[in-house]
Amino acid sequence: MATTAPNLHSLSSSFAFSNPSSNVSATSFTFQIPNKKAQISCISSKKLHTQKSFNFHDAVTPMNKPSFGRDLMVAQATEAVAPTTEEAATSQPKTSKKAKKLKYPRRILDVYQILQSPIITEAAIKNIADENSLLFTVDVRADKKMIREAISNFFGVKVRKVNTLIRPDGTKKAYIMLNKEYNASELAKKIGIFPGGN
C-alpha cells in the first residue's frame, strides 16, 4: 500500500512489505524538490540506516551526465590526428640550404714543383747524346701528362715521350725524350748541365 501527499514543494512516499522473510518492515522517502536534495531513511527490525545529503539530480538523471573521460580522449585523439595550421607549419622539418663550397683542384703543382732538378750522371749524359733525352728528378705526385706540359711550357720544346721511374729511396725520375727537331745537347747547355752554357 502506497500513499503520496499532493504537495508541490515536498513529496513523501511510504511502502509496506507484507513478506515475513524480509528484514525491512517499512521504508519511507522524502524529497525536497527546490533544493534537489533528499533524505532516505530505512527502518528495519534489526538496524536503522540513514543516508544524508543525497543528491536528487544524480538519482533522477544519471544517464544525462556527459562522460568527461571519453570525451577528453576523443578530443585529444582529434587534435593529434588533425593539428592546427600553426602546429603543422612548425612541425614540418626545416631544410636549410647551405652555400656550396668552392671545389679546389686536388693537385696544385707548378713547374718548379714538378721539375725539381736535372740528373747529371754519366748515364744521363750518355742518354742526352744517344737518345736525345733529358733526365729530371720530378715530384712524386706528378704524372706523365703534367711532366710533358711542364717541359713544353718552361723550355718551349715538344716532347715525344715521357717515361717515369720511382727509385727505392722514394724519389721519382723522369726520362724526357724530345722530338728530332730539337737537340737535347743544346737544351742541356742552356740548363747548365754541360759547361759553357749561357
UniProtKB/Swiss-Prot annotation:
Principal cellular location given in the protein's record: plastid
MF (Gene Ontology): mRNA binding; rRNA binding; structural constituent of ribosome
Keywords carried by this UniProt record: Chloroplast, Plastid, Ribonucleoprotein, Ribosomal protein, RNA-binding, rRNA-binding, Transit peptide
Chain segment of the transit peptide: 1-76
Name assigned to this protein: Large ribosomal subunit protein uL23c
Native organism: Spinacia oleracea (Spinach)
Subunit structure: Component of the chloroplast large ribosomal subunit (LSU). Mature 70S chloroplast ribosomes of higher plants consist of a small (30S) and a large (50S) subunit. The 30S small subunit contains 1 molecule of ribosomal RNA (16S rRNA) and 24 different proteins. The 50S large subunit contains 3 rRNA molecules (23S, 5S and 4.5S rRNA) and 33 different proteins.
Compartment list: Plastid, Chloroplast
Task of the protein: Component of the chloroplast ribosome (chloro-ribosome), a dedicated translation machinery responsible for the synthesis of chloroplast genome-encoded proteins, including proteins of the transcription and translation machinery and components of the photosynthetic apparatus.
Family of the protein in this entry: Belongs to the universal ribosomal protein uL23 family.
InterPro entries tied to this protein: Nucleotide-bd_a/b_plait_sf (IPR012677), Ribosomal_uL23-like (IPR013025), Ribosomal_uL23/eL15/eS24_sf (IPR012678)
GO biological process: translation
Keyword Transport: no
Keyword Plastid in annotation: yes
GO cellular component: chloroplast; cytosolic large ribosomal subunit
Additional remark text: Two forms of the protein exist; they have the same N-terminal sequence and approximately the same molecular weight.
Pfam families attached to this UniProt entry: Ribosomal_L23
